[in-house]
Amino acid sequence: MLLDKLSRPLKVLRISLTDRCNLRCNFCMPPGKEYNFLPKRQLLTPEEIEEYVKIFAKLGVEKVRLTGGEPLLREDLEEIIQRISKVEGIKDIALTTNGVFLKERLKALKEAGLKRITVSVHSLNPEKNQKLVNRSVNLGEVFEVIIRAKELGFKVKVNSVIIKGFNDDEILDLARFFKNLGVTLRFIEYMDVGTVNDWDFSKVVSADEILNLMKKEFTFYPLPKRPEDTSMDFIYEDGNKFGIIASVTKPFCRGCNRIRLSADGKLYTCLFSDKGHDLRNAVDKENFIKEVWKDRKDRYSELRRQMKRERKVEMFKVGG
C-alpha cells in the first residue's frame, strides 16, 4: 500500500476537467471577464485522463471525482466517464457541478457510468444567489434536475457553503427544503482556499454553530465517521440525512486520502497547496506519483493559525 509521510493511503483522485465556469462564485472564481483561463488545447484529453487513472488505480485509488471549474463545460465529459468506468479497480465515479447544464445530459451521464452527483446550491433566494455567483441562475430548474437525477438512480447530494452575514440566515431553510426533497445536504464551512475570496475567520460559521441552530428545529443523531470522511454526517428521525464539512474548525487532515489533478496535468497533494507537480511531463509517471505521495506531509487545516498567508492554488484550478 502506498503511504505518505503521515501513513495516509492514496484512495481518492479528484480531477479538475477545466478551470472555466459559467458562474463566478465569490469564494472560488476570479472576478471580471479578463482572466486568462487555460486554452482548450492545454486541457487533459480523455486519453490522457484514462492513462493516468489506470496508473492511479494500480497504486490503490478506488474512487474518482470529476470537478472544475464546471465539468459540464467539457463536451467530451461522457467519453471521459466512460473511459474511467472501464478501468479495473475503480469502484466509484462522482461529479461535482452547479447543475445549470445538467438536465440535458443526465441520461447520457448515467449510461456512461456516472454513479453520484453533488450539486452546489448556496441560497434558495434568487437575488441573494445572484450576488454570490454573479450570474442569473434559474434555481427552479436546478431543483428540478436534482429531483430528476434522483429519479434516474443517481446518488445525489447538495453542497452549501455558509458565509456569516450572507447566507447563514438560510441554514434552517436550506435544511428544511432538501430534507423535504429527500436529498442529503452538506453544509460547508467557509474556507480560505486560494487568494481571490478575501477570506477572514470572522466570516466562518462553525460546525458547532450550525448544529446548535439545527437542534432548535430538528431531531437528529450522529452517524459513525471514518478517519478519511470529510463530512460529519447526521440522520433525521425520518431517515433523511445531512452533513457538515468543517475543514476550518474540525480539520480531518489526519485521514485525508485524496490527491488532486488539475486540468493541465499538475498534481496537488492538498486543497491548500501552494504548488503543483507536473505529471504530464513526467517520463515515468507511476514512479513520479509514488514519489509525490511518499513525500506528502500536508496538514494545512490543522496548522492554519500557524501558517503564513502565502499564495495558494485557486479553487477553480483544482476543484473543491
Curated annotation (Swiss-Prot):
It comes from the Bacteria. Keywords: 4Fe-4S, GTP-binding, Iron, Iron-sulfur, Lyase, Metal-binding, Molybdenum cofactor biosynthesis, Nucleotide-binding, S-adenosyl-L-methionine. It catalyses: GTP + AH2 + S-adenosyl-L-methionine = (8S)-3',8-cyclo-7,8-dihydroguanosine 5'-triphosphate + 5'-deoxyadenosine + L-methionine + A + H(+). Pathway: Cofactor biosynthesis; molybdopterin biosynthesis. The keyword Disulfide bond does not apply. Its EC number is 4.1.99.22. GTP binds at residues 14, 65, 96, 157, 258-260. GO terms for molecular function: 4 iron, 4 sulfur cluster binding; cyclic pyranopterin monophosphate synthase activity; GTP 3',8'-cyclase activity; GTP binding; metal ion binding; S-adenosyl-L-methionine binding. S-adenosyl-L-methionine binds at residues 69, 120, 191. [4Fe-4S] cluster 1 binds at residues 21, 25, 28. Binds 2 [4Fe-4S] clusters. Binds 1 [4Fe-4S] cluster coordinated with 3 cysteines and an exchangeable S-adenosyl-L-methionine and 1 [4Fe-4S] cluster coordinated with 3 cysteines and the GTP-derived substrate. The keyword Metal-binding applies. PANTHER family: MOLYBDENUM COFACTOR BIOSYNTHESIS PROTEIN 1, MOLYBDOPTERIN COFACTOR SYNTHESIS PROTEIN A. Catalyzes the cyclization of GTP to (8S)-3',8-cyclo-7,8-dihydroguanosine 5'-triphosphate. This is GTP 3',8-cyclase. It comes from Aquifex aeolicus (strain VF5).
